[in-house]
Amino acid sequence: QEFNYLKQNIDYDKEHLERLLPNNNLNRYSNIRPYKDNVVTINSENKNINASWIHLPNNNNFIGTQGPLDTTIDDFWEMCYSYKVKVIVMLCKLQENNKIKCAKYWDSNNVKKFILKQINSEFDLIDGVKVRNFEIKKNQNDFFPNTVIQLHYTCWDDHSTPDVDSYNKLIKLFEFLDYYKDNSPVVVHCSAGVGRSGTFIALYNLYHNILRQIKDNQINEIKFSIMDLVRKLKEMRTHSVENEGQYKFIY
C-alpha cells in the first residue's frame, strides 16, 4: 500500500510529471528524465545529462544518474571533474539479458575530451565488488587532476533485489565508500539510475541513520520512516526505488 501510494502520488502525479525535462537523445530511457529544478548541469553550454541532485541529511549528497551512453561518456566525466567527484558506485553490468545497460565509460579509448588514466589494476574488494582507480584531467598541462574510485557491484540484476546474504556486502561497500568520499557528491548509477540506484541510496542513508541514533542517544528504540525517505528520493529523482520488491528489500 505504501509503495503504490508513493508511485501514484509522485511518479505518476501530474504536478511531478510537469517538472520533468523534455525527452531528448541524451536519455537512455524516454520515461526516466530528471526534474527541471534539480538537474545536474555541466559547464559546457550549461548542458545537462540524465543526472539528478539528491541531497539528504548529514551532508549525504549524491548524484543519481543513468549509465552513460556512448554519446554521453565525455559529459559524464566532465560532470565528475566539475564537481570533484571522488567515488562512483556502479550497480549494473555492461550487458544484462543480452541488452546493453551501460557504456564502458572507463575505457580511455572512449574518452575524447579528457585524459583518463587507470592508476592501478582493478581488484576485488569482496566477491561481487570490483574496485578501479582513475585519474582524470583536462589536458597534459592540467596539474590538478581529479582522482576517482569506482566501486562496481556486479551481483544485482535489473528490476530485482540482491539476496539476503548481500546485506553484508552492501555494508562493506558503505564502509569503503565512506573512507574515500570526503565532502564531494557520490555518483550512483545503474542503467536507468532509479531502481537499484535509489534503493542503494536509501539503504546507505538508513544504515547511517541507525548508527548515528545508536551512537548519539544510546537508546533501545530506533526511529526512522522508510516511506518518508523514499518519498524524498522520488521527489528528487523520478521512479527512485522502482518496484515493490526493492521497497520491501529496504525494510
Language-model region placement:
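Cys-based phosphatases of the PTP/DUSP/CDC25 superfamily and their flanking regulatory architecture
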Residues: 1-251
